[in-house]
């Protein structure tokens, strides 16, 4: 998992509530078992025209001034719906490192923490300020200090200390388990052989 400490990036405002996992990555694109290749179909039904499948120039991800943004600012209950891990994979594959929402579905939130997508909860008034930032401007997400900063604004957020440790050190569950490799090996040597 890639380490996340401080992200300095533009934001993509998508201030809609109840964006479900089928809107994030529709079911017809879930045929791959790898974690890559999903970004091109992120928000597919909004991003492309239904009749021609051409890019919808009115959708924010298709606007050139937002191409490099790594932070998505969105509404309440983000990632609701089915439990597909592919939704997080699609966001990561597109280039997002952080999502700032009012709330998340529990399963989406856990999938995010396990796949290196920092999911931050902020109240609507704070997100409204962040969503109004011009495309060329950048904000700072400072995980060690648990702050989102932009000019005179500073928004504090909460995160489970274990997840914070995992993000800052780039540790997934397997890497954390491997920290105990010597203890695991010692335990395995003590197990009687039943052959």
Curated annotation (Swiss-Prot):
Which keywords describe this protein according to UniProt? Amino-acid biosynthesis, Branched-chain amino acid biosynthesis, Leucine biosynthesis, Lyase
Q: Which InterPro entries match?
A: 3-IsopropMal_deHydase_ssu, Aconitase/3IPM_dehydase_swvl, AconitaseA/IPMdHydase_ssu_swvl, IPMI_Swivel, LeuD
Which Pfam families does the record associate with it?
Aconitase_C
Pathway given for this chain reads: Amino-acid biosynthesis; L-leucine biosynthesis; L-leucine from 3-methyl-2-oxobutanoate: step 2/4
GO MF terms listed in the record are:
3-isopropylmalate dehydratase activity
The family database entries (Gene3D superfamilies) matched by this protein are listed as: Aconitase, domain 4
Show the catalytic activity.
Answer: (2R,3S)-3-isopropylmalate = (2S)-2-isopropylmalate
GO BP of this protein: L-leucine biosynthetic process
Q: Does the keyword Plastid apply?
A: no
Enzyme Commission numbers on file: 4.2.1.33
Example GO CC term: the record gives: 3-isopropylmalate dehydratase complex
Superkingdom field: Bacteria
Q: What class of enzyme is it?
A: lyase
Write out the similarity annotation.
Belongs to the LeuD family. LeuD type 1 subfamily.
Subunit structure as annotated in this protein's UniProt entry:
Heterodimer of LeuC and LeuD.
Question: What does the protein in this record do?
Answer: Catalyzes the isomerization between 2-isopropylmalate and 3-isopropylmalate, via the formation of 2-isopropylmaleate.
Q: What is this protein called?
A: 3-isopropylmalate dehydratase small subunit
Organism name: Oenococcus oeni (strain ATCC BAA-331 / PSU-1)
* Source species taxonomy: Bacteria, Bacillati, Bacillota, Bacilli, Lactobacillales
């Amino acid at each position: 998992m890639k380490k996340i400490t401080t992200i300095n990036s533009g934001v993509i405002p998508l201030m809609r509530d109840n964006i479900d996992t089928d809107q994030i990555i529709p079911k017809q694109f879930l045929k791959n078992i790898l974690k890559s290749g999903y970004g091109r179909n992120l928000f597919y039904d909004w991003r492309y025209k239904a009749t021609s499948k051409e890019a919808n120039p009115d959708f924010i991800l298709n606007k050139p001034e937002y191409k490099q943004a790594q932070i998505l600012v969105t509404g309440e209950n983000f990632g609701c719906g089915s439990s597909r891990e592919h939704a997080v994979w699609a966001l990561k594959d597109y280039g997002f490192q952080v999502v700032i929402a009012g709330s998340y579905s529990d399963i989406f939130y856990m999938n995010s923490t396990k796949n290196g997508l920092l999911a931050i909860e902020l109240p609507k008034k704070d997100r409204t300020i962040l969503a109004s930032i011009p495309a060329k401007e950048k904000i700072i997400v400072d995980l060690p200090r648990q702050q989102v900063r932009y000019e005179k604004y500073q928004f504090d957020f909460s995160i489970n200390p274990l997840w914070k440790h995992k993000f800052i050190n780039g540790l997934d569950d397997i890497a954390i388990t491997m920290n105990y490799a010597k203890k695991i090996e010692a335990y395995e040597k003590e197990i009687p052989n039943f052959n």
